[in-house]
Structures are given as structure tokens and as C-alpha cells.
Swiss-Prot record:
GO terms for biological process: alternative mRNA splicing, via spliceosome; mRNA splice site recognition; negative regulation of keratinocyte differentiation; negative regulation of mRNA splicing, via spliceosome; regulation of alternative mRNA splicing, via spliceosome; regulation of keratinocyte proliferation; regulation of wound healing. It comes from the Eukaryota. It is found in: Nucleus; Nucleus speckle. This is Serine/arginine-rich splicing factor 6. The keyword Nucleus applies.
């Protein structure tokens, strides 16, 4: 009985070690990612306003088209019955 218990404890220990290893890896990845993102965002922020305006106008036109489509759909539904 005592032998099986010691085996189980050693297994759980190895599992916890592998978990801590994967955690440290994910932590290092997150740090490197956040660093690269910060550098990129700083360089991009200078050229952002122009692209922002264009994307905003595009999204507005898209939403208008979708609104018109939904209106035409509702009209066709009301006409059919």
C-alpha cells in the first residue's frame, strides 16, 4: 500500500513540474509579445489618423448598405403574406 502511494505522489509531482514549465514558457511569450506590440503601436500611431478616417467612412457605408438590405428584406416579407 505504501509503495503505491509513493508512486502516485511522484507522478503528481512530475505533472506539477511540467505545468510550471508550460506556465513559465507562456509568461515569456506574453512578455515578448507585449514588448513588440508596444514598439509597433508607437510607430503606427503617427500614421494612424488618415487611415482611421478612411476605415470609419468605409464602416459607415457598409452599415448603410446592410440597413437598406434588411429594410428590403422586411418589405418582401410583408408583401408575401
Amino acid at each position: 500500500r505504501s509503495r503505491s502511494r509513493s508512486r502516485r505522489s511522484s507522478r503528481s509531482r512530475s505533472r506539477s513540474i511540467s505545468k510550471s514549465r508550460s506556465r513559465s514558457r507562456s509568461r515569456s511569450k506574453g512578455r515578448s509579445r507585449s514588448r513588440s506590440k508596444g514598439r509597433k503601436s508607437r510607430s503606427k500611431s503617427k500614421s494612424k489618423p488618415k487611415s482611421d478616417r478612411g476605415s470609419r467612412s468605409r464602416s459607415r457605408s457598409r452599415s448603410k448598405d446592410e440597413y437598406e438590405k434588411s429594410r428590403s428584406r422586411s418589405r418582401s416579407r410583408s408583401r408575401s403574406p
